[in-house]
């Protein structure tokens, strides 16, 4: 164990550092050809045509773990696979934050599950708003550092690229935060939309900053949202703690199988092509939206979506909905009283969206 490891484990709740968790029938490596240790049925269900569903699944399937580690550029022991990034967020908050004592810092407007998990844990929530200026939204790094130090935050969530605003945080700024908060907080960088970004992943920084945690998902670029496969990438000792806090069998066998197929060389080639097409469509859609008279502002985006301010966001939302086009209403979020978030679709879908918005302009006031 290296000299840095205690620093990471010291950030975990004291009673969980040596917590053994639940020892399931699959958590112990055993060999044999007659398995009678888990009270599973000896016969498959009639609906199980391949007779593969009667056994409990591997808690952390080695093949999928290796594939994800190769995809993200880390070691398999640095990966915890969970039910989407949502489970990773929840595990981190529960493992690190003492209720009513250890704060969680977020940067609104931002993905809501960080705050939800903090509230479920009864952890104080510290909010450092993003700054909206001529260049777009961006993180207020000095304010984040000051607030984290003053509040003694144990978890700092940074969404990059950020949902719903689309802004990515430069690596140098993230490294500044990591350097300043070493030993006092876990810095969690959510890269759910990383495949669409020009900013490189922060995963290589894990070698120098063991208090860095990275969240990744197969839901966005890899088009496997229903499979619910997310990854927590972190120091191996922290991953081991999180695994002990996780449910015994979190990953259904069909989901694991689909994820492995989705990470084959052929599938990754298709994914890369689609990401390139989405990035190109994102810029086409952004330019076209900016020309509409009812649009106040289209923010630059490093994700697969655009945040758009409208003169009349309600009219735009209702017109789109009436035409069968569903977008995300962001008007209840801080600083976004006039904004909608538009996912970048296929070229045909984007053209249809634009046609509806152009029709609004054509209607006399």
From Swiss-Prot:
Record keyword Amino-acid biosynthesis present: yes
Keyword Transit peptide: no
Catalytic activity: L-histidinol phosphate + 2-oxoglutarate = 3-(imidazol-4-yl)-2-oxopropyl phosphate + L-glutamate
GO MF annotation terms: histidinol-phosphate transaminase activity; pyridoxal phosphate binding
Annotated signal sequence range: none
Modified residues (N6-(pyridoxal phosphate)lysine): 220
Domain of life (superkingdom): Bacteria
Pathway: Amino-acid biosynthesis; L-histidine biosynthesis; L-histidine from 5-phospho-alpha-D-ribose 1-diphosphate: step 7/9
Name of the top EC class for this enzyme: transferase
Enzyme Commission number(s) from the entry: 2.6.1.9
Keywords, comma-separated and alphabetical: Amino-acid biosynthesis, Aminotransferase, Histidine biosynthesis, Pyridoxal phosphate, Transferase
One GO BP annotation of this record: L-histidine biosynthetic process
Gene3D superfamilies: Aspartate Aminotransferase, domain 1 (3.90.1150.10), Type I PLP-dependent aspartate aminotransferase-like (Major domain) (3.40.640.10)
Matches recorded under Pfam families: Aminotran_1_2
Known partners and oligomeric status: Homodimer.
Protein name as catalogued: Histidinol-phosphate aminotransferase
Organism listed in the record: Xylella fastidiosa (strain M12)
Gene that specifies this protein: hisC
